[in-house]
Amino acid sequence: MSLIDDTLEQIKAVDPALLAEAQVVLDNKTKPPGSLGRLEEFARRYVAIIADPENSDLELLGTKVVYTFAADHGVVEEGISLYPKEVTQQMVLNFLNGGAGVNVLARHVGAEVRVVDIGVDYYFGMVPGLVVRKVARGTANLAQGPAMTREQAVAALEVGIGLAAQAKKTGVTMLGTGEMGIGNTTPSSAIIAAISGKTVKEVTHRGTGINDAALENKIRVIEQGLAVNKPDPKDPIDVLAKVGGLEIAGIAGLILGAAANRIPVVVDGFISTAGALIASELNPHVKDYMFAAHESVEIGHSFMLQHIGLKPILDLQLRLGEGTGAALAMGLIEAGVKIYKEMATFAEAGVASE
């Protein structure tokens, strides 16, 4: 059995009884039932995900890690981005130096950022802190043919699965997804169009801030890519290989690995949710393990979230990526879990419950 098949086999729906038990605990806290709104939802879901009946002393709140996957895209040569692909490698170094948006917000919530070179078209050498899992030096131009081979897509999925398994062994109790890849809103729009049947125009936006003419070109390029490649919507790996990206595949794998290892995973924005969409098409139960950090201003994002069945935590008009929204949402999820852990019960506080 392959690593992917084995991982998919391990992913089961979260037990409704565990959700109910967590809610009973929350209802016994010194507050009216449900009065902490979605914080209770976050706590209930988190506790049910991470619960281990064989280990009652399991640490609920261990290490929080955002994995930021970096890769390049051949489709950039079609003029679909404001920025040259060299920005990908430059931003990787910025992440490693702690100077990017995700670094600032991760520090704010006490999370670690781990940067993964899964497909940057650049050789970094021995750079301290960089997790090197390069599958290829970027994808091919999806407008002219498949972005990658099926074997490359599988290898990138396996990178993410492996990182999640490693995280479990080292005491990580919450994962976040992030990415860096100039041009990566283009494959993300292609993925949602291929899987959902929405028109490209319905799910394609300005990415880094392109003008009207560039947006029309971007739509044309994606339509051409879908026509040339004919991805099979019933085969998520085919969609991923033909019109996806290496960092998107890594994110999908991380989500699958998180679900298989019962680790809550906070999904960032548009590109990360493209990975989540691939993961959920491979096994619908992964939805139980995901928290949608926010709803991006990218118009295709809401369609993705609806398709998976996720309700975003935040709406802050974010469109940066990197894992910025995931880092912010981690703080709110952790707040809910601390209510579950630390808030007094009626009996403990000597407060009447009725």
Curated annotation (Swiss-Prot):
One of the record's GO molecular function terms: nicotinate-nucleotide-dimethylbenzimidazole phosphoribosyltransferase activity
This protein's record includes keyword Iron-sulfur: no
InterPro entries: Nict_dMeBzImd_PRibTrfase (IPR003200), Nict_dMeBzImd_PRibTrfase_bact (IPR017846), Nict_dMeBzImd_PRibTrfase_N (IPR023195), Nict_dMeBzImd_PRibTrfase_sf (IPR036087)
Active site location: 322 (proton acceptor)
Pfam family, one: DBI_PRT
Catalytic activity field: 5,6-dimethylbenzimidazole + nicotinate beta-D-ribonucleotide = alpha-ribazole 5'-phosphate + nicotinate + H(+)
Any one biological process term the GO annotation gives: cobalamin biosynthetic process
EC number, as in UniProt: 2.4.2.21
Gene3D superfamilies: 1.10.1610.10, 3.40.50.10210
Keywords: Cobalamin biosynthesis, Glycosyltransferase, Transferase
Pathway: Nucleoside biosynthesis; alpha-ribazole biosynthesis; alpha-ribazole from 5,6-dimethylbenzimidazole: step 1/2
Family indicated by similarity: Belongs to the CobT family.
PANTHER family linked: NICOTINATE-NUCLEOTIDE--DIMETHYLBENZIMIDAZOLE PHOSPHORIBOSYLTRANSFERASE (PTHR43463:SF1)
Function in brief: Catalyzes the synthesis of alpha-ribazole-5'-phosphate from nicotinate mononucleotide (NAMN) and 5,6-dimethylbenzimidazole (DMB).
Name of this chain's protein: Nicotinate-nucleotide--dimethylbenzimidazole phosphoribosyltransferase
Source species of the chain: Geotalea daltonii (strain DSM 22248 / JCM 15807 / FRC-32) (Geobacter daltonii)
Gene name per UniProt: cobT
